[in-house]
Curated annotation (Swiss-Prot):
Keywords: Cytoplasm, DNA-binding, Transcription, Transcription regulation. Residues 1-14 have a biased composition (Polar residues). It comes from the Bacteria. GO terms for biological process: regulation of DNA-templated transcription. It holds the Pfam family TACO1_YebC_N. HAMAP family: Transcrip_reg_TACO1. This is Probable transcriptional regulatory protein lmo1535. NCBIfam families: PRK00110.1, PRK12378.1, YebC/PmpR family DNA-binding transcriptional regulator. Residues 1-22 are annotated as: Disordered. GO terms for molecular function: DNA binding. It comes from Listeria monocytogenes serovar 1/2a (strain ATCC BAA-679 / EGD-e). It is found in: Cytoplasm.
């Protein structure tokens, strides 16, 4: 992963996502609803605890979080969402994974296909690009105000169960096996650390630089996908400088 900081990619798109905060909250509410159907108590439901932490990290109001949990707990309408993943390529051969939660697969697949086709991309079959990504736990700790040195922190994180640690001037990035993510997170929390990001995510095994003549179409395609109410996450192997 060295040299391909996910944190840099996150920061590179942060302003655009902040401008759509209400849509972010709407999508998180759906994710909370789905997780809470497995149980409303986050201490007994790791999936709910994880998405609640994700919601709090973007300052989603507690009332919104509680409302989504209550809706799932008292759901008698039969409302339900299926998890669906779409795979394909953006212009220039950039691999794209689209994760959706939908109550209408036909609607979502049509919208996703249009987003690809209208912007020079192509939707592929299951397995066409997913082999280029690994699922990992991902934690980010801001270094501002910390006194711990790099070697000391790296040792601490590895002893907590981390698979890898990347160090930059501003942040520590910690990568874990998905199965040990919660364990590592809790160990570092108990050591006094707080997280700017804590999530399970997909990471490219190889990054692909976007050619300048493909950048506009690529940006439009990502915007179209992220604007879709059913799309929860979009992962690519684009390298953002």
């Amino acid at each position: 992963m060295s040299g391909h900081s996910k944190w840099n990619n996150i920061q590179g798109r942060k302003n655009a996502q902040d401008s759509k905060r209400s849509k972010v909250f709407q999508k998180l509410a759906r994710e909370i609803f789905v997780a809470a159907k497995k149980g409303p108590d986050p201490s007994l439901n790791p999936s709910l605890r994880l998405v609640m932490d994700k919601a709090k990290a973007v300052n989603m109001p507690n009332d919104n979080i509680k409302r989504a949990i209550d809706k799932a707990s008292g759901n008698t309408s039969g409302e339900n969402y299926d998890e669906v993943t779409y795979e394909g390529y953006a212009p220039g051969g950039i691999a794209v994974l689209v994760h959706a939660l939908t109550d209408n697969k036909n609607r979502t697949s049509t919208n996703v296909r249009v987003a690809f086709n209208k912007n020079g991309g192509s939707l592929g079959e299951t397995g066409s690009v997913s082999y280029m990504f690994d699922r990992k736990g991902y934690l980010v700790i801001l270094r501002e105000g910390l006194t711990v040195d790099e070697e000391e922190f790296m040792l601490e994180a590895i002893e907590a169960g981390a698979d890898d640690v990347e160090v930059s001037e501003d942040v520590f990035e910690i990568f874990t096996d998905p199965a040990t993510f919660s364990e590592v997170k809790e160990a570092l929390q108990e050591a006094g650390y707080t997280f700017a990001t804590a999530e399970l995510s997909m990471f490219p095994t190889v990054y692909n630089e976007i050619a300048e003549n493909n950048q506009t179409q690529f940006d439009k395609m990502l915007e179209a996908l992220e604007d879709d109410d059913d799309v929860q996450e979009v992962y690519t192997n684009a390298e953002i400088n």
